[in-house]
C-alpha cells in the first residue's frame, strides 16, 4: 500500500487545509459517533449549499473525534449531521501530513479494476470484513473554504473515500461484505444485530 500513501502525500500537499488540528488522541471524542442500529446512519445526506464558519467548526470537531477514536475517516452522518462532508487522514501518526476535507464529493470516474480488502468502521467497532471496490477513482469536491478541488485516488485513499461516501447514502461497509458467514460471526461476536444490515451483495 506504499503507493497509496505516496499518492496521499502528493494530494494532501495540494489540498493542504487550514483546519488541521492536533492528532494527539484524547480520552473522549468531541462528538458522539453513532453505531450500527442508529437510524441516522441510514439517512441520505444533503449537499452543503454554503461553506461557512459553522461548517469549518464542524470539520474541526469531526477531526478531533476521528483522532480520538483512532480512525482514518469520518463522515458527517456518523455524528448525526446529514450533510455531505467527509474528513480523511490515512497517516494519523504523522503530524506533518494534513487531513483531507471533502465537501459535496462526487466520484466522476471508477477504474475497471477492482480490489478486495478488509475494512472496518468507527460506527461498527471491532468488525472487520472483506469488501470489493474499484481500485482507483476520480473525485470532485469542495474544500473547507468552498474552493473546487479534484483528486485522482488509488489504493487505500480510493477505498477510504468510497467507504466514507457510502455513509452519505446511508450505506455501511457491512452491507457490502462479500462473505455472509464471516459477517454473521463478526456481528454476533461484537454485539451487533443482523437485522440492521442491508445486504448489497451475496456470496
From Swiss-Prot:
InterPro entries: Peptide_deformylase, Peptide_deformylase_sf. Its EC number is 3.5.1.88. Fe cation binds at residues 121, 163, 167. Its cofactor is Fe(2+). It comes from the Bacteria. Belongs to the polypeptide deformylase family. Removes the formyl group from the N-terminal Met of newly synthesized proteins. Requires at least a dipeptide for an efficient rate of reaction. N-terminal L-methionine is a prerequisite for activity but the enzyme has broad specificity at other positions. This is Peptide deformylase.
Amino acid at each position: 500500500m506504499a503507493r497509496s500513501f505516496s499518492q496521499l502525500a502528493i494530494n494532501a500537499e495540494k489540498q493542504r487545509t487550514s483546519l488541521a488540528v492536533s492528532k494527539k488522541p484524547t480520552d473522549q471524542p468531541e462528538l458522539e459517533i453513532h453505531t450500527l442500529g442508529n437510524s441516522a446512519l441510514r439517512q441520505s445526506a444533503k449537499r452543503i449549499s454554503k461553506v461557512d464558519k459553522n461548517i469549518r467548526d464542524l470539520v474541526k470537531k469531526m477531526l478531533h473525534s476521528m483522532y480520538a477514536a483512532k480512525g482514518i475517516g469520518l463522515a458527517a452522518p456518523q455524528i448525526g449531521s446529514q450533510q455531505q462532508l467527509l474528513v480523511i487522514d490515512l497517516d494519523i501518526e504523522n503530524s506533518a501530513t494534513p487531513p483531507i476535507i471533502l465537501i459535496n464529493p462526487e466520484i466522476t470516474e471508477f477504474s475497471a479494476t477492482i480490489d478486495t480488502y478488509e475494512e472496518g468502521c468507527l460506527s461498527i467497532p471491532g468488525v472487520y470484513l472483506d469488501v470489493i471496490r474499484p481500485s482507483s477513482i476520480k473525485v470532485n469536491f469542495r474544500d473547507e473554504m468552498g474552493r473546487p478541488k479534484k483528486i485522482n485516488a488509488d489504493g487505500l485513499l480510493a477505498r477510504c473515500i468510497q467507504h466514507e461516501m457510502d455513509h452519505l447514502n446511508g450505506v455501511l461497509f457491512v452491507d457490502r461484505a462479500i462473505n455472509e458467514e464471516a459477517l454473521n460471526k463478526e456481528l454476533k461476536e461484537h454485539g451487533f444485530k443482523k437485522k440492521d444490515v442491508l445486504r448489497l451483495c451475496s456470496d
